[in-house]
Regions:
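Class I SAM-dependent methyltransferase SAM/SAH-binding core
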Residues: 273-321
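Conserved Class I S-adenosyl-L-methionine
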Residues: 143-166, 174-178, 212-221, 404-467
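Flexible "cap/lid" loop of the alpha/beta hydrolase fold
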Residues: 87-118, 380
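Conserved class I S-adenosyl-L-methionine
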Residues: 362-386
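Short beta-strand/loop motif that positions the catalytic acidic residue
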Residues: 184-186
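A short acidic, Gly/Pro-enriched loop at the edge of an enzyme's catalytic core
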Residues: 322-332
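Class I SAM-dependent methyltransferase Rossmann-like catalytic core
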Residues: 228-258, 263
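A short glycine-rich, Lys/Arg-flanked "PGG" loop and its adjoining helix->strand segment in the class I
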Residues: 345-360
Length: 467
């Protein structure tokens, strides 16, 4: 195995670790933009799978893994020996499976065998054209792929590592498999891994699938922008919108109040944790209903909720929840926040540890279809919202019983595109994009050209009980 740093600074606290595919090294990934606050390293050449390559890595608050092609199966083997100091918090699979050569779950065995036996300089070039989806796109990546090229003997040895007799996975439904992978991206035009086989593989363990047009070599920039959260940017955007949030975020305010209306508890919780309190809409609802409860808040924004007394912890909730005492809280609340997390699944697993037996967690988030107007912009990036079924799967994996799950739909109408863009700014909803002004301008221009000014929200309410 080999590792190359694409980006590294002693001041960063997060790591993006990319497991590349066969015959492709770090050169391919030099073209992409990466979010601030992350070191970025690329791993390739899985002839010998060993965690020795990670021995010199320093401590990180959080590590996000994007594994592509044969890198998926490789990381699936390596993750159990990944140093704990890296704090793995998200694993994304891209056009690959944990059983890479399999007639039902990966590359069919006869195709793999033919590729291996016929490997040559000529066939390798043909393979590279296929991963690009054809000659036109291959032209865009030809120079990078040429730089990646290793000698044929070495590439053959690397490929033999994945032969069925050496790398077959039978334990598809183990708890460990279900707790590792957060999402799987599948390109519908993949000419290497059959898309239907990939769907079979990920459906077996309940991993949420995101399907998109494209080839085996996907739009990595879009994937990076979609799944890797720039937490500092999110915090800045919500800090700047804090004073205007309650006046303009009518959908989010309704969702927070509706969540409390759905909450039922036989006894008043003594210790309550709220994640992402923002301006304090839900916080005040909790304090009014349970005036004796001791409240703890975690938020990326720097200001504690107004009108309430409690303990405020400033920072990333996905990191801080790992540092709080187990079985300490009676209830956990979060309104309109968990969609910003890298891993809602791991959050639920950690939340279950914090709750006493029988404790409950109440979440409001958003379902697929939310802000679909933004995703229609050229180059627009939206959050990969989870469906109610995906949330229920993650809840069961984490040890929760689903007490209530309810979805609504709300469409906001604006008299002008400028008003819509202003709404995004004043509510912090545009916190995912790196260039909010540019993205808002594109959104305004797009909607005005169609004569429409709407934003769609699908609030999702979830109440879970620890078993």
């Amino acid at each position: 195995m080999k590792l190359h740093w694409q980006k590294q600074s002693s001041e960063t606290t997060r790591l993006l670790l990319i497991f590349s595919g066969w015959s492709v090294d770090w050169h391919l990934f030099a073209r992409y933009d990466y979010p601030a606050g992350y070191d970025v390293a690329v791993v390739w050449d899985y002839t010998v799978l060993s965690n020795d390559i990670f021995a010199d890595l320093r401590d990180y608050d959080e590590t996000v893994v994007i594994a592509w092609s044969f890198g998926v199966a490789s990381f699936n083997v390596l993750h159990q020996s990944l140093p704990s100091r890296l704090n793995l918090n998200c694993a994304i699979a891209v056009n690959g499976t944990i059983s890479p050569v399999d007639d039902n779950f990966g590359i069919p065995e006869n195709i793999f065998s033919a590729t291996l036996s016929g490997l040559s300089d000529v066939s390798l070039k043909g393979f590279q054209r296929r991963i690009c989806g054809g000659g036109n796109r291959y032209k865009d990546f030809k120079d990078d792929l040429t730089l990646c090229r290793d000698d044929i003997t070495s590439l053959k040895n690397q490929l033999e590592t994945f032969s069925p007799e050496k790398h077959r996975v039978e334990t598809w439904k183990t708890a460990e498999d279900k707790r590792l992978w957060d999402r799987a991206f599948i390109s519908t035009g993949d000419l290497i891994f059959p898309p239907d086989n990939m769907k079979n593989a990920w459906n077996c363990i309940g991993t949420p699938i995101i399907s998109a047009e494209g080839s085996h070599l996907p739009d990595f920039q879009h994937i990076i922008d979609t799944v890797v959260r720039d937490k500092s940017l999110i915090g800045q955007q919500f800090n700047s919108s804090n004073k205007t949030y309650e006046k303009h975020a009518e959908v989010q305010i309704h969702a927070a109040r509706q969540l409390m209306a759905l909450w039922r508890s036989a006894t008043a919780p003594a210790q309550v944790l709220e994640i992402g309190p923002g301006s304090g809409t839900l916080s005040r609802e909790i304090a009014t209903r349970y005036p004796e409860a001791k409240l703890t808040w975690i938020d990326l924004a720097e200001t504690s909720p107004s009108g309430c007394n409690g303990t405020f912890l400033h920072g990333d909730a996905e990191i801080i929840v790992k540092q709080l005492p187990n079985e300490y809280f009676d209830a956990i609340f979060s309104a309109n926040s968990v969609q910003w997390f890298h891993s809602p699944m791991r959050f639920l697993i950690n939340a279950a540890k914090l709750l006493k037996k029988g404790g409950k967690i109440a979440l409001s988030t958003f379902a697929p279809g939310t802000l679909n107007e933004i995703t229609e912009i050229n180059g627009g990036t939206s959050l990969p919202y989870l469906s109610d079924n995906e949330w229920q799967h993650f809840a069961k994996t984490a040890g929760f019983e689903t007490e209530k799950i309810k979805e609504e739909k709300s469409v906001l109408k604006f008299t002008s595109g400028r008003g819509l863009a202003d709404h995004l700014k004043k509510t912090g909803v545009n916190a995912l994009t790196k260039s909010p002004r540019k993205d808002n301008f594109a959104l305004m221009r797009n909607l005005m050209s169609r004569g429409e000014c709407t934003l769609t929200f699908n609030p999702l309410y979830i109440i879970l009980k620890k078993q």
